[in-house]
């Protein structure tokens, strides 16, 4: 890490993931910026930077889960930073909400992922840093630079010691490229689950393409929400004779009873990142958290020094 000359660097945290921001600042050995946030009786959000940011390189860390309030807070932070004459303002969005609304797949629906990109730019973002977007084409929705990080180093390092007799599973066709990159990195086989989704947050496992009998299985995905699809995949793999079953998922939304579903499933361990805070896990939980702080910290300091970020990720996306 090149930590020299960070005098113009300032990192501020929104309210959605203060813990991750603290870890980023600790990694970089910089003090977290001071900011005031108030919620008025009618729900309006008020933001004030408590230190001078004129001419500074400002990074605002805020995941947008749940999206409505946290996105609005980020927009207000961006506007306040721009109006305070920051030299450059970067929105660091560990989890980019609305990413699943990335295309017009039905009549009379919005492409909300594009809308969010537009309003972030309009609010004052000069650049965006995010991780494992649900759809790669979202990168093209922005008219400003976007650094797209990958959580894969967190998990491939973990599974270097567990790769014997391992196959990597993509839970759908859309994730096959990232699953293939894991498989190549771990020298493992590749399996695809063919599924259809009759309704939102519901998926029916249709067919498993590949051999899992007697194999250790690693399911990789960008997010886990209600866990219904994930648990169904675990069950289907187990019925086909899979031995140990692991998961590596970047964004742990874990809505509703998702944690209970995971704990009661046949999975051995589910690894997730801290792009979304998880504070209610039991000590012996099957869900294991891997911090993404170093990846975000390195991307911030390299961005600050105008250095390459792609070298952080030796990932084959072909």
Predicted segments, located by residue:
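PRPP-associated nucleotide enzymes
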Residues: 1-318
């Amino acid at each position: 890490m090149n930590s020299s000359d960070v005098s113009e660097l300032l990192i501020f945290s929104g309210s959605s993931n203060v813990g991750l921001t603290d870890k980023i600042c600790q990694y970089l050995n910089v003090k977290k910026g001071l900011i005031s946030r108030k919620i008025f009786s009618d729900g309006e959000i008020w933001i004030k930077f408590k230190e001078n940011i004129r001419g500074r390189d400002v990074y605002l860390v805020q995941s947008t889960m749940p999206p409505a309030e946290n996105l609005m807070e980020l927009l207000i932070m961006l506007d306040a930073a721009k109006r305070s004459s920051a030299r450059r303002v970067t929105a660091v969005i560990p989890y980019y909400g609305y990413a699943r609304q990335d295309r017009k797949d039905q009549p009379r629906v919005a492409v909300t992922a594009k809308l969010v990109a537009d309003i972030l730019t309009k609010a004052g973002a000069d650049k965006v840093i995010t991780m494992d977007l649900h759809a790669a084409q979202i990168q093209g929705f922005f008219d400003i630079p976007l650094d797209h990080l990958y959580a894969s180093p967190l998990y491939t390092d973990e599974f270097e010691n567990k790769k014997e007799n391992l196959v990597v599973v993509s839970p759908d066709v859309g994730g096959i490229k990232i699953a293939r990159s894991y498989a190549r990195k771990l020298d493992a086989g590749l399996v695809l689950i063919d599924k259809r989704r009759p309704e939102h947050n519901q998926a029916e496992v249709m067919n498993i393409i590949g051999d899992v009998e007697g194999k250790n299985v690693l399911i990789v995905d960008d997010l886990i929400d209600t866990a219904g699809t994930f648990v169904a995949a675990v069950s289907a793999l187990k019925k086909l004779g899979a031995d140990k079953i692991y998961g590596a998922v970047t964004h742990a939304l874990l809505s509703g009873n998702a944690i209970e579903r995971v704990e009661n499933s046949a999975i051995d361990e589910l690894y997730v990142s801290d792009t979304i805070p998880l504070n209610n896990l039991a000590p012996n939980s099957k869900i294991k958290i891997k911090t993404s702080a170093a990846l975000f910290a390195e991307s911030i300091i390299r961005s600050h020094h105008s250095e390459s970020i792609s070298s952080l990720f030796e990932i084959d996306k072909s």
